[in-house]
């Protein structure tokens, strides 16, 4: 019997990236998706992260577990701390959006490139990188860029133009041991990236699926 993975996402444009990652890495897994767009709607509407956010996250993760999930992946990049706080009450492995990517980045070296299309996502990722560095006594340097003009384009449905803008920005970030893409919705752009020797590109969905497979399937 295949293992069931619950994917909880606040944006529907993350679903294709997650499906691609599972197809590439762990096609035998059964993936069940739970979408709650209200999380980002409220976060972007000026509320930020509130007590209600934690309560709703607890409900979502518990629902996914109750639906038979053997492991859970949450896709929203700005809710990492919320996921980490709530998952202590969940009995199956739960990954926040970025943690596996950060672990792989530090395994690859100490010079990081970080590319996002939303400043809020960038800051959350930078905070998580710094926290990992402090907790594991691993120094690092990084270059960062927000390709903010690409965000409204993908929200309008123009994935092709969005992906080309992300690829153009990525191809300028060469002086690093790895390049991290800060949002699930950026994953489709990777196929357009130039092949730069010695600079692997890390995406949140692919690194997360690799870690879940390692934890659950060996």
Predicted regions: what they are:
Residues 1-218:
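Non-catalytic structural scaffold of enzyme domains
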């Amino acid at each position: 019997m295949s293992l069931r993975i619950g994917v909880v996402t606040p944006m529907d444009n993350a679903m294709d990236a997650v499906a691609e990652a599972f197809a590439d890495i762990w096609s035998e897994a059964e993936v069940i998706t739970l979408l709650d767009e209200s999380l980002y709607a409220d976060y972007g509407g000026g509320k930020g992260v509130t007590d209600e956010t934690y309560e709703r996250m607890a409900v979502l993760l518990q629902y996914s577990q109750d639906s038979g999930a053997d492991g859970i992946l949450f896709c929203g990049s700005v809710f990492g701390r919320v996921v980490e706080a709530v998952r202590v009450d969940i009995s199956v492995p739960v990954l926040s959006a970025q943690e596996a990517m950060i672990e792989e980045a530090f395994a690859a070296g100490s010079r990081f490139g970080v590319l996002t299309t939303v400043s809020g996502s960038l800051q959350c990722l930078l905070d998580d990188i710094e926290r990992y560095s402090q907790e594991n006594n691993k120094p690092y340097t990084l270059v960062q860029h927000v390709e903010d003009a690409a965000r409204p384009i993908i929200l309008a449905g123009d994935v092709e133009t969005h992906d080309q803008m992300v690829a153009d920005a990525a191809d300028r970030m060469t002086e690093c041991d790895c390049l991290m893409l800060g949002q699930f919705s950026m994953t489709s752009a990777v196929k357009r990236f130039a092949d730069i020797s010695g600079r692997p590109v890390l995406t949140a969905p692919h690194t997360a699926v690799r870690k879940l497979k390692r934890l659950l399937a060996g």
